[in-house]
Design a protein with these regions (language model features):
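Nucleotide-state-sensitive switch-loop elements of NTP-binding domains
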Residues: 63, 79, 85-94, 99-236
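The conserved Walker
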Residues: 72
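Conserved lysine of the Walker
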Residues: 76
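Short catalytic-loop micro-motif centered on adjacent basic/acidic residues
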Residues: 162-163, 247-250
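Short, surface-exposed connector motifs at secondary-structure boundaries
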Residues: 89-93, 243-248
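C-terminal lobe/tail of nucleotide-utilizing enzymes
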Residues: 1-63, 240-245, 252-309
Length: 309
């Protein structure tokens, strides 16, 4: 049995005063009372432009990649799974990929998802990128190119460079690029980690260049060098191509997830990537808001929906 219950508020938890008030309720066991409408009556939900989802998500001759980003807990996993199922039901062969070690797509789909693509239902497959396995595979691929061409001292230096903290993330990035390049799937949906981690992955093409150069310098064949360099350029081009890659932000209408999503959008823009869809999750329908608790919470949400617009 829980020793204390933390009740969902009718408003966001923000500021010292609000935290102090909630702490008193939490540790005294006093339940919150919603006797009045504390907030100004909400205006109508702002009219939000609805994009043509099929045009946005369905492929047009090339593999399409869909990335869902956002603060932890906003519903990325559920929305990624729903999106993948929606596309698969259209007869499109779809792969759902998670790069977040804490993701629960297997629990949402009610199936076991491992490090190899598993068939979930008609046209839908799912896979979880095991970062440790991806790291070992990535590291070995680079070192195998260098063995027999460099001294043991040089190989040791390269291995030390590959053991840097960001290489594991680079390996995960390289793995999901492989899925995009894989012609077996028409659409690849990525249930990504919380925003900061995802943006770190999206910064990798620029750090990745250094390790591409390692592979290039280790290769004697001019053809191998050109292939590695062209692949790197293609990765950047694919991420920036709105027809091939769609970045979506998932949030709920409160201050913190909105600000985090806004910063992510600006960071993407700086990298030459446009956010094409914003999903506002957990919005209360007006018809269920029949008491002060729900009315207050909806008033807050409508205010933030206006900001999102």
């Amino acid at each position: 049995q829980p020793k204390r219950c933390m009740y969902l508020r009718d408003n966001e938890v923000k500021g010292v005063s609000a935290l102090q008030h909630i702490a008193r309720e939490l540790y005294t066991g006093k339940k919150p009372v919603y006797e009045i409408e504390r907030m100004q009556p909400a205006r109508l939900v702002p009219k939000i432009e609805r994009p043509d989802i099929d045009a946005l998500f369905l492929p047009a001759g090339q593999t399409k990649a869909l990335f869902f980003m956002g603060k932890g807990g906003v519903g990325k996993t559920s929305i990624s799974c729903m999106t993948a199922l929606y596309i698969a039901q259209k007869g499109v062969k779809t792969l759902l990929v998670t790069t977040d070690p804490a993701a629960h797509i297997g629990e949402v789909l009610d199936v076991k998802v491992g490090s190899m693509p598993e068939n979930i239902t008609d046209n839908l497959f799912a896979v979880m990128v095991n970062q440790q396995e991806a790291f070992q595979e990535y590291k070995e691929r680079i070192l195998s190119e260098a063995r027999g061409r460099y001294s043991e001292d040089m190989l040791a230096t390269m291995e030390e460079e590959l053991n840097s903290p960001c290489t594991e993330e680079m390996a995960a990035f390289d793995k999901f690029i492989q899925y995009i390049e894989d012609k077996d799937y028409e659409v690849v949906v990525f249930d990504t980690a919380p925003t900061g981690h995802t943006l770190r992955l999206l910064d990798l093409p620029f750090d990745y260049a250094k390790q591409v150069e390692m592979m290039v310098s280790a290769a004697e064949s001019r053809e191998i060098k050109e292939t590695a360099q062209n692949r790197f350029r293609d990765i950047i081009s694919t991420l920036r191509d709105k027809k091939r890659t769609v970045f979506s932000l998932v949030l709920y209408p409160e201050s913190t997830p909105i600000m985090e999503s806004y910063r992510a959008m600006l960071d993407l823009k700086e990298a030459g990537i446009e956010t094409q869809l914003v999903v506002a999750n957990m919005v209360l329908p007006e018809e269920v808001c029949t008491n002060n608790y729900f009315k207050n919470r909806r008033h807050m949400q409508v205010k933030y929906l206006e900001q999102i617009k």
